Amino acid sequence: MPVVYYATFVVIACAFFLIGRNFIDLKRHDEGNELMVERAAIIRSGANTFLKREDRAIVVVIGIVAIFYTLIHEAWAGPCMILGALLARSAVEIGMRGGTYGNVRTTNAARVTGAVSRTIRIALLGGSLSGFTVPAFGLVGFTIVFLVSGGARADVTGHSLLFANSVNAITIRLTAYSLGCSLVAMFNRVAGGTYTKSADIAADTVGKKNHGLDEDDPRNVCSIADLIGDCVNDIAGNISDLLESFVATPLACILIAMQTFKADPRMLTATCTFPFVLMTGGLVSTLLSVMFVILKNRKHHKWVMMTDAEFNEKYPDETNQPKYHDVAEKPGFKLVHVGYSLDIEDPSGELNLATAISAIIVMVVGVYGANRIFGGMAIPEFKLGWISPWVAAVLGIVSSVAIGKITEYYTSTKYAPVQDIAKAAIEGEAFLVSEGIAVACKSVLTPVIIIGVSMLVSNALCGTYGIAIAAVGMLSFVGTTVSIDAFGPIADNAGGIAESCGLPEEVREITDQLDAVGNTTAAIGKGNAIGSAAFAAVALIISYIGSYPAADHITTGLIVSVLVGLILGCAVEIYFIGVLTKNTERAAEKLADEAERQLNLPGVMEKTRLPNYNEAIELAADNALHYMLVPSILSVASPIVLGIPFGPDIVIGMLAGAVGTAIVMAIYNANAGGAFDNAKKLIEMGLLSGHPKGSPAHSAAIVGDTIGDIMKDVVAVCLDISIKTMSTVSNSMAMLFYSSSLRLF
């Protein structure tokens, strides 16, 4: 066994250690006053309730699909699928603990310290649990399945329990493992997106529009459901989505390597090993970069001497007082902890630092690994020799960073697009929405060009293997990306807890600052997820084309079938968007009705009694799980419904149409939603002169934010998992389409 696999397991063990260490460190921090503890417990309980209900559905679906794969495809495919689902679900559980324990501690850090640096540290500490689990859990299962199945060998065959078929056991088991991760991601993304955005829209409609309540006013039951939804979608959904991408990209590498280099055992071993070098190097870079930023913001306490009178005047509320010590030498004086002497002004700088460190480490590890693995080999397929795969990986890394920067430009409050949307709000809702649509449309072209150029250059350097390696490079430091992404919902939750508990305005100012950055990091994360999905899906389509004897026939003949499939693929994704949007709207209507009912109960508006949060939480969970059925079936069943009656050719067209449509629409929806959200945030932060919070411009911005909610947190995030699921299902069913389809036309 090559030394890289031993190194992989050592790094994974280090990741598991740091996950435990960071969770213990997180729980050491105080949750705050009694009301803060109570609010956090409700959010934690609600998130757990949703996941438990979702688990019942996941167990049934995974069980049925696993049995089908074991009976029809390969005997060990089902267990591998179950392993993938279990590891994905375990990663979600750990990440959710980081979010639901980190949110209130982030609030308390802002309350007690008044320092952005300390608040960032707690939020990133919670986010690191998500970031470390994604590559660690995804990689450990993938490596075990790969090695136990035989490793880099094209001659390992397997058989189903029902038929005497002969398949490559390694590729079918890895595909099944990836599909297990994919199905969990589909549940979390579709159900989680419906949950969070139905609650968010209902909270805004009932609270802000109908009753003039603040966003996180505790009288509005949907406000608590909204905070739970942030964890469910932006943490659980993001973890499972990017874990599936992290697994799908090396899968594409190995599938293509098995098809392209099966006649050359040495080359097959090298091309199958290199993705593990990049993924292991990426995990190392994540651990080092995230821990560096966490530890960097650890100290720098600032204490100020105050008289008792000054202290009591500044901090009259005993529940919101900072730490202090009575000075024995000076009776009547206190030494008060007021913050940190080296606080930071721009939180995004700390997060960008982690990304930069990760990218540099991966590139260094990658060039060393490429030299050790491919150095000295004569490889005609590699135009630049041994360094070609590394260049392809760097293209993926550069694409990831570039897409992130472009996304930041179109969605951050610091730049013109969001500022222009906020200014358009002065003229009313129609102008604001039109400006937002224009910004979103313009934001699509450059990322698509970057993705396209990277694919073309990677293909020119290493063939189709290069495209898959570029995807691995893009996702190699996914742990850093996920850590930063999880920072967003934790900061958002922290702000919600601060508002619902009536904490001082200074606390909300800090959490709002972090929340605005979190909105941008979430948009960047969505951009990276979409870009990586494009690379992975194209690589999987290429693998699908080469997976059966009729490959040449598919690409040159039956053009009509391919074109029909292309049109159907486009239509399926557009229909998918419509179903998601309508389902979220229906769920929001039901939640809004429940919120109105409870606000009309005696004493709720007067704050003499609390509403029943559990009723709204359970309603949101039931709606989400009910409405996820059709879109999930659409993604899983579409290739099968077309492939079995009409053959494999039409499926190629369907995949191509679906990928093209999904990538463009995902970027459009993600950036539109992020820009609308931060345009509202810009006004709420007082940055639109003469138009404060509560003004007509702010009301218009709320409308834009409500429209953008479904676009970015439901549609955009579900499109990328949809095309990955369709591509993975198609790869696993390719031989069945070829050998058993009815070929009606």
Model segments located where?
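Hydrophobic packing and interface segments
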Residues: 1-745
